[in-house]
Amino acid sequence: VITSYFGRRNTGIRGASTYHEAIDIANSYGTAIYAADGGTVTYSGWRGGYGYLVIIDHGNGYQTYYGHNSSLVVSTGEHVYKGQQIARMGSTGVSSGNHCHFGILINGTFVNPLNYL
């Protein structure tokens, strides 16, 4: 279930941006999070408001972000394939409930993930 869409939004969470550069997909705590495509994990760890975050570089200027995880199952530098589990859903960082903050960065600019799914 998508609980927050890409773009401007009203949020009651202190410290949360009013421009959302991703979509939020909600499910139960611990739900498996899978890589949208194959690539190399360039970041796997804690990053402020994102909480536990995984970033995958897919090449050609294309990266995906997976934030607010409860735990991570991949490490920086690891090669992953499309559909491989990379994390477990949670509510870490600046978050109001269990969800995956899913973002797509193309050539340094976040784009609406719904245009690519």
Name each model feature, range by range.
Residues 1-117:
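Catalytic cores of peptidoglycan-degrading enzymes
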